[in-house]
Amino acid sequence: MIIVTGGAGMIGSNIVKSLNDKGFNDILVVDNLKDGKKFKNLVDLDITDYMDKEDFITQIMAGDDFGPIEAIFHEGACSATTEWDGKYIMMNNYEYSKELLHFCIEREIPFLYASSAATYGETDTFIEEREYEGALNVYGYSKQQFDNYVRRLWADAEEHNETLSQITGFRYFNVYGPREQHKGSMASVAFHLNNQMNAGDNPKLFEGSDEFKRDFVYVGDVAAVNLWFLENGVSGIYNCGTGRAEPFRAVAEAVIKHHGKGEVETIPFPEHLKGAYQEFTQADLTKLRAAGCDVEFKSVADGVAEYMAMINK
């Protein structure tokens, strides 16, 4: 059995789909369906069982056995970069993750987890090293702190000549693609621009967006990276992006191209995002490629075109 936490979320459900595509369906999905709309991400997927997140945490902390587990993909987290309840964020993204990590280490279960490019903050160097990290919000800090916790475990194991089971973290950059309709304001730019155009409006970007560039990565490619690392048993913390920074306007132009009409309009930059907004991200893929991962990443033009075709049927 493979366990996918956050399995009803965007990345988690795409990992489940990729597993299904490979003929694997002995999967336990763990999530919180308080937002019942997320169930739609599971309707077309084959899984063995579903468990509520709180029940799962309780059983993990009690040391309960779930039977033979081949791997755990830990995608469950509060992913809202605009959430400032630090106690809530640290409990969900840090404490819960530590409990699950030690559960896996004790049983030698491969543990593949979601980190984030939000760990880097305002920098133009995106290398998986401590010196380049400086989160701008509490979400990014929770991910940064968990990465550092994992690093300390590796250092301690090395000092004592011990070898830990597989632990692999992925610093996701700007992920977009299918199964994100439940995310509200945290859904991708492509999703929001498409909704605007379907409502008869022009696509709207923040003022200054011509200067903002992000590494936009297609969710299908993210799932492929996760499965590659499971299949190859490689540990480490790795950037998961395309290695290319593209302007927000490129996303808007891809959406406009699909619809065959429209032009970009600008709106004021939100006050609440000032000082907590990454204006530039670009994954350095040196470490990912050195590990042997050869997954090819779609450009914005190709990825958004595929995405638009899927959600505008």
Curated annotation (Swiss-Prot):
InterPro entries: Epimerase_deHydtase (IPR001509), Heptose_epim (IPR011912), NAD(P)-bd_dom_sf (IPR036291). Pathway: Nucleotide-sugar biosynthesis; ADP-L-glycero-beta-D-manno-heptose biosynthesis; ADP-L-glycero-beta-D-manno-heptose from D-glycero-beta-D-manno-heptose 7-phosphate: step 4/4. It comes from the Bacteria. The keyword Metal-binding does not apply. The gene is hldD. This is ADP-L-glycero-D-manno-heptose-6-epimerase. The keyword Transcription does not apply. The active site is at Y139 (proton acceptor), K183 (proton acceptor). Its cofactor is NADP(+). NADP(+) binds at residues 10-11, 31-32, 38, 53, 75-79, 92, 143, 175, 183. It comes from Aliivibrio fischeri (strain MJ11) (Vibrio fischeri). Substrate binds at N174, S185, H192, F206, E207, G208, S209, R214, Y277. Its EC number is 5.1.3.20. It catalyses: ADP-D-glycero-beta-D-manno-heptose = ADP-L-glycero-beta-D-manno-heptose. Catalyzes the interconversion between ADP-D-glycero-beta-D-manno-heptose and ADP-L-glycero-beta-D-manno-heptose via an epimerization at carbon 6 of the heptose. Homopentamer. Contains a large N-terminal NADP-binding domain, and a smaller C-terminal substrate-binding domain.
